[in-house]
Amino acid sequence: MNIFADFSDRIINAVKALELKPKEGGELDLSRVAVEPPRDPSHGDIATNAAMVLSKAVGENPRALGERLAAALAEDPDVAEASVAGPGFVNLRLGNGFWHARLGEMLLLAGDYGRSKMGNGHKVNVEYVSANPTGPMHVGHCRGAVVGDALSNLLAFAGYDVTREYYINDAGAQIDVLGRSVLMRYREALGEDIGQIPEGLYPGDYLKPVGKALADEYGTKLLERPAEEALKIAKDTAIDAMMAMIREDLAALNVHHDVFFSERSLHAGNGGTIRSAINDLTLKGHVYKGKLPPPKGQVLEDWEDREQTLFRSTDVGDDIDRPLIKSDGTFTYFAADVAYMKDKYSRGFEHLIYVLGADHGGYVKRLEALARAISEGKLHLTVLLCQLVKLFRNGEPVRMSKRAGEFVTLRDVIDEVGRDAVRFMMLYRKSDAPLDFDFAKVTEQSKDNPVFYVQYASARCHSVFRQASEQLNVRKFDREAMKAALHRLDDPGEIALIRKLAEYPRLIESAAQALEPHRLAFYLYELANQFHVQWNRGSETDRLRFVKVNDPELTHARLGLVQAVCDVVRSGLALVGADAPEEMR
């Protein structure tokens, strides 16, 4: 249960019970009433601005109205204290019984605690990674992969019908370059001295196995084929090999996709799919023949000093109109984007989310304009831009390139620090802020390493249960027995920990609404910190120990609290895409 949504209903009902009468010409706008945690926890558990936002409409002093509202809310059996602070904020402190009941619900729901129906099954498409199939994934791809995957997990947990998609850029000039690069490696595999790879081709050694595979399959016969046919074979083989490599990299990072969509499929049949999409835009009045003015102070993709077929994107929010068909009759890159978005819309998605690198910032307005044009304003589109990741080791910058044609790959990073560290740390900053990734920091066992600190909380929870099992000679602890004893929890630290656990459903919904999966990582660190603090208090003060052999009922109550922490940490880490270990190794 989202306790803040619950108390929002209670506060609105209390406001209605006051029978406030708006002044002539005024109205009570209850949508402005906010219910949230107080900025200062010492002020209570729930805070509302209701008196402040409604006072003007009813012509009453906000503090006086706050006093009336506080008096009404004090009648609620779950409210231990209702007070007014500042100009009219109403703060509520909830009784221990309320928190015991919430903890009981957590134990009942277990791994489903925090799951929401907020999304109501709305269809969302999240496109992320979509790295060109021209080589292995490098660390620059990593952040978008983690953000997109964790966001998809979060949205699904919040009740949305999520499709995770990868757009394979397997058409265009970079694929021709890939094919020519592989043909060089093919000749090398046949024993030819190819010398230095020419500038403009891909020089990486990762293409050598592809060249060898062609040599093994075709021998010298590929040299006898027409150049265009040989290039097509090389391109097809290379794309398959690169995508297999990329899929392996994604699997190593625990990143998943439901759909891999090929750009080449849009160009099949003489580009019939693209032509159909452009025709649809034409019928809606969004396409015309014309000549764009020369760009001022910038390089404009696909600009020609000739008449082209153009998308009238300035009518739907873009800065400039966009070329669709060049003067020679060939499609622009953007033309394929038109067909691809139309395909997504035809699949019934209500919200399209693109997770892109910061260098794609120029795409935002054109994609938003395209969504408006295709759907006539019905399609919701969001672009999340991920800023750069900088690598460090003990505070010293790490070179992103290892040697000519080679770079620090995603697999290099995973092999050194582990998948969980990579995933958690990629979410430990908001995606639009630059991220510093220090190999030494993410492997140290200290509070300063967030992923260790959170996973250590999971391991400690399990160690408490192992200790309790040994000392009480109980093989397995029953959740109902733990739930029945929760009334014994009265230490302020215990109540504070329950309060933190009770924030989880609200955190899920707010993070999903804001499309900000980094909030999960922040919350997990805060929860882990409170748990470690309570564990340390027990190690220093005997009466606060989780396991009290001479008081089985209190032990069951405290184990219920530990179980809830364990459940939420496991749930949150699963959404992040990391494991919740039972032991630290």
Curated annotation (Swiss-Prot):
GO terms for biological process: arginyl-tRNA aminoacylation. It comes from Chelativorans sp. (strain BNC1). Disulfide bonds: none annotated. InterPro entries: aa-tRNA-synth_I_CS (IPR001412), Arg-tRNA-ligase (IPR001278), Arg-tRNA-synth_N (IPR005148), Arg-tRNA-synth_N_sf (IPR036695), ArgRS_core (IPR035684), DALR_anticod-bd (IPR008909), Rossmann-like_a/b/a_fold (IPR014729), tRNAsynth_Ia_anticodon-bd (IPR009080). GO terms for molecular function: arginine-tRNA ligase activity; ATP binding. Belongs to the class-I aminoacyl-tRNA synthetase family. It comes from the Bacteria. This is Arginine--tRNA ligase. SMART domains: Arg_tRNA_synt_N, DALR_1. Its EC number is 6.1.1.19. Keywords: Aminoacyl-tRNA synthetase, ATP-binding, Cytoplasm, Ligase, Nucleotide-binding, Protein biosynthesis. It is found in: Cytoplasm. It holds the Pfam family Arg_tRNA_synt_N. It is an enzyme of class 6 (ligase).
